[in-house]
């Protein structure tokens, strides 16, 4: 469940700690709306704070 961060929870909190939303996890995740409801997050890497990492999935 590495690429299930935003997609799995629907919010995408874990990469950023922006109020529990986490837009911008690695390289431009926020640009695609990683915290807008589970869209594509560019190429986030498994380095989130909550433990939900995105391995460059979209």
From Swiss-Prot:
<comment type="function">
    <text>In the hair cortex, hair keratin intermediate filaments are embedded in an interfilamentous matrix, consisting of hair keratin-associated proteins (KRTAP), which are essential for the formation of a rigid and resistant hair shaft through their extensive disulfide bond cross-linking with abundant cysteine residues of hair keratins. The matrix proteins include the high-sulfur and high-glycine-tyrosine keratins.</text>
</comment>
<comment type="similarity">
    <text>Belongs to the KRTAP type 19 family.</text>
</comment>
<dbReference type="InterPro" id="IPR051528">
    <property type="entry name" value="KRTAP_type_19"/>
</dbReference>
<dbReference type="InterPro" id="IPR021743">
    <property type="entry name" value="KRTAP_type8/19/20/21/22"/>
</dbReference>
<comment type="subunit">
    <text>Interacts with hair keratins.</text>
</comment>
<keyword id="KW-0677">Repeat</keyword>
<dbReference type="Pfam" id="PF11759">
    <property type="entry name" value="KRTAP"/>
</dbReference>
<dbReference type="GO" id="GO:0005829">
    <property type="term" value="C:cytosol"/>
</dbReference>
<dbReference type="GO" id="GO:0005882">
    <property type="term" value="C:intermediate filament"/>
</dbReference>
<keyword id="KW-0416">Keratin</keyword>
<protein>
    <recommendedName>
        <fullName>Keratin-associated protein 19-6</fullName>
    </recommendedName>
</protein>
């Amino acid at each position: 469940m590495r690429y299930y961060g935003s997609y799995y929870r629907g919010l995408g909190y874990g990469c950023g700690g922006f109020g529990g939303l986490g837009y911008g996890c690695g390289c431009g995740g926020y640009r695609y709306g990683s915290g807008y409801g589970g869209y594509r997050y560019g190429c986030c890497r498994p380095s989130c704070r909550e433990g939900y990492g995105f391995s460059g999935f979209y």
